[in-house]
């Protein structure tokens, strides 16, 4: 069977650009990643009752999940994998650290009991990443991942709608697409959950700086490649101000959680 879901070709930046972005973001990531930590905690809360002996933290970033995974599974051999060596250098919890690509895992077939990934697969060809997860999981092994859905950063799309025709966010898969791709990858007992997380910022510049600080400002084809004029920035800023709440300017994370078994 082949997937009816076309890869979002050209909508993701190159691996080199992703790596460079997260290399630059590594020093600021932890200070800016409050929502990312919250999502990681929610992902852990949904895990089934398992006792893995070998687990992978795929796209581990600075390793926030590692302390949680170590506490929960103290006897497991843990591999923390990320595309960015700079991120890996900041993983403090003792584990096996590996620089690698989620689409080409440097792991043997059927070597994992748990494939864990929080907010990393949105940078990948999801169909390929899920096939790699299936390949490396043992029979009965569990995948638990968090990704982002289509409503993510909709405020940015609103802000720039009348400014230009460039893309200002990644193209994200819907829950239905993620479910279908997981099934096509050979995964079973698929459970999809959703949550909405909203960050608030005092002004538009701070919002944009926060996106950059977590490395989420890289886009693929269709992105703006030239500097924005002052008038264009002010137009986007004015549009974003229309969305202001008493808490500040909102920025939405449309979070999708996938749990499944091989």
Swiss-Prot record:
InterPro entries: BioC, Malonyl-ACP_OMT, Methyltransf_11, SAM-dependent_MTases_sf. Keywords: Biotin biosynthesis, Methyltransferase, S-adenosyl-L-methionine, Transferase. The keyword DNA-binding does not apply. The keyword Ubl conjugation does not apply. Pathway: Cofactor biosynthesis; biotin biosynthesis. GO terms for biological process: biotin biosynthetic process; methylation. Converts the free carboxyl group of a malonyl-thioester to its methyl ester by transfer of a methyl group from S-adenosyl-L-methionine (SAM). It allows to synthesize pimeloyl-ACP via the fatty acid synthetic pathway. Belongs to the methyltransferase superfamily. It is an enzyme of class 2 (transferase). This is Malonyl-[acyl-carrier protein] O-methyltransferase. CDD domains: AdoMet_MTases. It catalyses: malonyl-[ACP] + S-adenosyl-L-methionine = malonyl-[ACP] methyl ester + S-adenosyl-L-homocysteine. The gene is bioC. Its EC number is 2.1.1.197. GO terms for molecular function: carboxyl-O-methyltransferase activity; malonyl-CoA methyltransferase activity; S-adenosylmethionine-dependent methyltransferase activity. Signal peptide: none annotated.
């Amino acid at each position: 069977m082949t997937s009816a879901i076309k890869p979002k070709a050209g909508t993701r930046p190159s691996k080199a650009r992703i790596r460079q972005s997260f290399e630059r973001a590594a020093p600021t990531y932890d200070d800016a990643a409050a929502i990312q930590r919250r999502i990681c905690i929610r992902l852990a809360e949904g895990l089934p009752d398992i006792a893995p002996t070998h687990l992978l933290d795929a796209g581990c970033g600075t390793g926030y999940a590692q302390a949680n995974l170590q506490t929960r599974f103290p006897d497991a051999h843990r591999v923390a994998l990320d595309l960015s060596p700079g991120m890996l250098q900041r993983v403090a919890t003792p584990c096996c650290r590996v620089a690698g690509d989620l689409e080409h895992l440097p792991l043997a077939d059927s070597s994992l009991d748990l494939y864990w990934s929080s907010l990393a697969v949105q940078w990948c060809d999801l169909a390929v990443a899920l096939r790699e997860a299936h390949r490396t999981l043992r029979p009965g092994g569990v995948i638990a991942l968090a990704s982002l859905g289509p409503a993510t950063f909709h405020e940015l799309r609103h802000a720039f709608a009348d400014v230009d025709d460039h893309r200002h966010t990644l193209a994200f898969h819907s829950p239905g697409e993620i479910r279908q791709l997981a099934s096509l990858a050979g995964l079973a007992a698929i459970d999809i959950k959703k949550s909405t997380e909203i960050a608030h910022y005092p002004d538009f510049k701070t919002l944009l700086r926060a996106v950059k600080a977590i490395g989420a400002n890289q886009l693929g084809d269709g992105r703006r490649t030239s500097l924005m004029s002052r008038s264009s920035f002010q137009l986007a800023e004015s549009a974003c101000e229309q969305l202001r709440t008493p808490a500040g300017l909102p920025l939405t994370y449309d979070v999708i959680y996938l749990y499944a078994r091989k």
